[in-house]
Amino acid sequence: MQAKLTKNEFIEWLKTSEGKQFNVDLWYGFQCFDYANAGWKVLFGLLLKGLGAKDIPFANNFDGLATVYQNTPDFLAQPGDMVVFGSNYGAGYGHVAWVIEATLDYIIVYEQNWLGGGWTDGIEQPAGVGKKLQDDNMLMISLCGLSVRILKVRQRHDQFNLLHKHPKKETAKPQPKAVELKIIKDVVKGYDLPKRGSNPKGIVIHNDAGSKGATAEAYRNGLVNAPLSRLEAGIAHSYVSGNTVWQALDESQVGWHTANQIGNKYYYGIEVCQSMGADNATFLKNEQATFQECARLLKKWGLPANRNTIRLHNEFTSTSCPHRSSVLHTGFDPVTRGLLPEDKRLQLKDYFIKQIRAYMDGKIPVATVSNESSASSNTVKPVASAWKRNKYGTYYMEESARFTNGNQPITVRKVGPFLSCPVGYQFQPGGYCDYTEVMLQDGHVWVGYTWEGQRYYLPIRTWNGSAPPNQILGDLWGEIS
């Protein structure tokens, strides 16, 4: 797609935007993301996706629009680049701005809401100019033909370099180190699962289908004293999140994790946690910790990492697991599109194996995401064939899940999914509902649920009005699990 403005025209637009306020999504006031979207809309007539600013490089398909570059110490940002700050900014949501000037040591940007007051009227914080030191947790985005790159910016905290130039000393580049895993062996006490009689033949890697709060420690708290009736619903050998590994079963024990006798008896099951609730960066870190633990165990058992020793849950039974890993590393969503095809299954296994082998060799692998994956959301987007349309023009489909509200009240409607329908009540922050239906109507995505005999309709994000499968959805106003 050709940008609507030339580079010089876009720079002029940035200059004229100074002192103005932008609230493109009409939500949470004048955020930095709104200012990025204002520029993107001027350039392409499109809006960027992502729950927070930090998600922009991963939540959007930049084919034909922008190119991703890895920054190097001698890389110089250009006017018009979009800079994206990581999760260590903006209370975990990151920050985004437009570059108008740069050296190897600092960038000068146009930005909005750097000080965090944009969620209110924020009139004292309109779009303005700021100066930032280069930081390793930044990314920058460049448009094709406009030189607006997505690049990683190195970290520079030496203020002296801003004023005094001097020859660079050649220094040895520090080698990355693997995180130190915190392995907690606390075997479940509600039932003594039988022994295998030998070491495992390999490892089955799972995605837990857990929420943001479903950490390894949370599983430990919920399962370590659970009765047999709960364990029969499923228990893996280890649960991994962050740098924590909770070992729930001894290596010698059979697990109940594949719904298959061979998988349960001969393979060690590891759950990558938070697969329905974590953002992509968090989930990818959980994966890396899992690969590191797999490498440790395989070396302990004297096994190589190959297609026989590294297995997927969907090899043993018809399941979408590992669903999140499938989307991220193959671009195929087994939740909405059906069982993972064999070529995608092998693609995912080979990715796992390559990562694990690197750890076994004492190296630190780099996590990669398929260019076929939007890598933008952990919410399920249904396929077009699942939607139906009623006489009122409402697109609807069956879907059962739990929605947990974010930090703002939402007006619930009765009768139907229209903003003109009677008000039911105010759905409070932190509240949740178990819904059975999803609808597209009146500029919003709605979920339908029944409470105390009354049917309610709750909007949970915006919708651009396009029919499935071409709908464009706004940020989710909470979490789905």
UniProtKB/Swiss-Prot annotation:
EC number: 3.4.22.-, 3.5.1.28
EC class of the enzyme, as a word: hydrolase
Keyword Transcription regulation: no
Domain of life: Viruses
N-acetylmuramoyl-L-alanine amidase domain span: 197-323
Catalytic residues of the enzyme: 32, 95, 111
Catalytic reaction annotation: Hydrolyzes the link between N-acetylmuramoyl residues and L-amino acid residues in certain cell-wall glycopeptides
GO aspect biological process, one term: peptidoglycan catabolic process
CDD domains in alphabetical order: PGRP (cd06583)
SH3b domain: residues covered: 398-466
Residues holding Ca(2+): 34
Entry's Gene Ontology molecular function annotations: metal ion binding; N-acetylmuramoyl-L-alanine amidase activity; peptidase activity
Cofactor(s) for this UniProt protein: Zn(2+)
Cofactor note: Zn(2+) is required for amidase activity.
Peptidase C51 domain ranges (all copies): 7-142
Binding site for Zn(2+): 206, 313, 321
pH dependence: Optimum pH is 6.4.
Keywords, ordered alphabetically: Antimicrobial, Bacteriolytic enzyme, Calcium, Cytolysis, Host cell lysis by virus, Hydrolase, Metal-binding, Multifunctional enzyme, Protease, Viral release from host cell, Zinc
Comment field on protein domains: Contains a cysteine-histidine dependent amido-hydrolase/peptidase domain (peptidase C51/CHAP domain) at the N-terminus, a central amidase domain and a SH3b cell wall-binding domain at the C-terminus. The CHAP domain is present at the N-terminus and is associated with the endopeptidase activity. The SH3b domain increases the CHAP domain activity.
Family to which the UniProt record says this protein belongs: Belongs to the N-acetylmuramoyl-L-alanine amidase 2 family.
Described function: Endolysin that degrades host peptidoglycans and participates in the sequential events which lead to the programmed host cell lysis releasing the mature viral particles. Exhibits lytic activity against Staphylococcus aureus. The CHAP activity cleaves the peptidic bond between the D-alanine of the tetra-peptide stem and the first glycine of the penta-glycine cross-bridge. The N-acetyl-muramidase activity cleaves between N-acetylmuramic acid and N-acetylglucosamine bonds.
Name of the molecule in the record: Endolysin LytA
Organism: Staphylococcus phage phi11
